[in-house]
Swiss-Prot record:
Gene that produces this protein: hslV
InterPro entries: ATP-dep_Prtase_HsIV_su (IPR022281), Ntn_hydrolases_N (IPR029055), Proteasome_sua/b (IPR001353), Proteasome_suB-type (IPR023333)
Keyword Protease on entry: yes
Keywords for the protein's UniProt record, in alphabetical order: Allosteric enzyme, Cytoplasm, Hydrolase, Metal-binding, Protease, Sodium, Threonine protease
Enzyme Commission number(s) from the entry: 3.4.25.2
The protein's name in its UniProt record: ATP-dependent protease subunit HslV
The organism's place on the tree of life at top rank: Bacteria
Family membership: Belongs to the peptidase T1B family. HslV subfamily.
Length: 176
């Protein structure tokens, strides 16, 4: 799987991810870009799960953003509705972490849209490790969002065999 982490702090929101793609217990590629910008660079998103499934979801989510003039929550809810009701989409196995300047959300394959506590998201196989590390740093340091995301991904990569140390990040200014 993978690790995606999103942190919002001090006027910044960042989503970072590792670059490992696996098939079973074999590493197939080490530099997959799982984090990207959407909707005229106003939304950042990361995926955990099947790569082909995630690219399909990115494309569908970007269409929803276009339909709803960039309104993140509305687009996420509409994607989740489609994901839940469309027979083909239900077979897709991926999670999305998405953020704009105001909101951070998790969109699940079950059709759920979750606004996380403390604006901290960590998904994928290394998610629990990254979340624990990031939460400790949020509560006990003055580090910025990018530094926290970097360190959380590094810790997850040290522990989770499906997460590597080839990281990619996208950042936006945050109003939240």
């Amino acid at each position: 799987m993978t690790t995606i982490v999103s942190v919002r702090r001090n006027g910044q929101v960042v989503i970072g991810g590792d670059g490992q793609a696996t098939m079973g217990n074999t590493v197939m590629k080490g530099n997959v870009r799982k984090v990207r910008r959407l909707y005229n660079d106003k939304v950042i998103a990361g995926f955990a799960g099947g790569t082909a499934d995630a690219f399909t979801l990115f494309e569908l989510f970007e269409r929803k953003l276009e339909m709803h003039q960039g309104h993140l929550t509305k687009a996420a809810v509409e994607l989740a509705k489609d994901w839940r009701t469309d027979r083909m989409l239900r077979k897709l196995e991926a999670l999305l972490a998405v953020a704009d300047e105001n909101t951070s959300l998790i969109i699940t394959g079950n059709g759920d849209v979750i606004q996380p506590e403390n604006d901290l998201i960590a998904i994928g196989s290394g998610g629990p490790f990254a979340q624990s590390a990031a939460r400790a740093m949020l509560e006990n340091t003055d580090l910025g969002a990018r530094q926290i995301a970097e360190k959380a991904l590094t810790i997850a990569g040290d522990i989770c065999i499906y997460t590597n140390h080839n990281h990619n990040f996208e950042e936006l200014p945050s109003k939240a």
